[in-house]
């Protein structure tokens, strides 16, 4: 095994399947052999049996739809704010210096602290959940966009200047296109992070939602239902991650 060796597609698929099989086999051994109590690690059978109960008793599909809506809205709003502002901050250092004293410390804000804050500001209705997801996403997306712009190679800027490009042409035809692939990757990362916030977003007054479903299951000590809810979140997260990754490859094929 060489450092950073290239892996063929066929071998990559085999390694992925092997990894899944090993982890699933370990889960089966630990649970079916009762090496770990089922209140800690339910068996795959118990988790599978939880899905019909969640579907009929807790509206699993509707909850998944509500969570997807909330995460998507927070994600889109964060992108609408972070991308233009990040492009400005990455392109013009004075703007970055002006904004940095306020925006940089926000990266260290505990996300859980935003729950009571957004409740005070927006109440406990739907707006609070979307604003919470927006705030939790935008504070991390913004510096990634700034970094994407700053990482565009100066050689391209110097070449454009030498060829007589104006400042607006350099920004519109060099900096922005050059930073878009990294911004696309940042969006993919932040989509995943958004799903990690959904439990907190739906902890208060959410009749439907995967986070609400998991919170209720936790209060009832239904560990199998918690696992089932988590698996649904993981599934949706993986699918949306794949969709963004495919879109990035199609939009920025020239990058590779």
Language model regions located:
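Periplasmic/extracellular loop-to-transmembrane helix junction in inner-membrane transport proteins
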Residues: 2-10, 32-76
């Amino acid at each position: 095994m060489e450092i950073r060796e290239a892996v063929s597609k066929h071998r990559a698929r085999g390694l992925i399947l092997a990894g899944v099989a090993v982890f699933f086999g370990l889960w089966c051994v630990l649970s079916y052999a009762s090496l770990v109590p089922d209140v800690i690690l339910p068996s795959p059978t118990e988790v599978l049996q939880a899905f019909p109960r969640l579907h009929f008793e807790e509206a699993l599909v509707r909850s998944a739809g509500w969570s997807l809506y909330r995460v998507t809205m927070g994600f889109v709003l964060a992108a609408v704010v972070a991308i233009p502002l990040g492009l400005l901050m990455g392109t013009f250092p004075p703007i970055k210096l002006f904004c940095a004293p306020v925006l940089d410390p926000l990266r260290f804000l505990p996300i859980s602290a935003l729950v009571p804050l957004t409740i005070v500001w927006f109440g406990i209705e739907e707006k609070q959940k979307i604003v919470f997801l927006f705030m939790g996403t935008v504070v991390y997306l913004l510096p990634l966009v700034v970094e994407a712009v700053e990482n565009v190679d100066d050689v391209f800027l110097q070449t454009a200047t030498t060829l007589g490009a104006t400042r607006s042409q350099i920004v519109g035809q060099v900096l922005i296109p050059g930073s878009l692939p990294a911004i696309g990757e940042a969006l993919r990362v932040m989509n995943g992070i958004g799903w990690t916030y959904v439990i907190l977003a739906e902890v208060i007054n959410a009749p439907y939602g995967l986070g609400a479903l998991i919170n209720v299951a936790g209060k009832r000590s239904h560990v199998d239902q918690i696992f089932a809810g988590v698996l649904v979140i993981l599934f949706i997260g993986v699918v949306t991650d794949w969709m963004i990754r495919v879109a990035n490859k199609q939009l920025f094929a020239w990058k590779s």
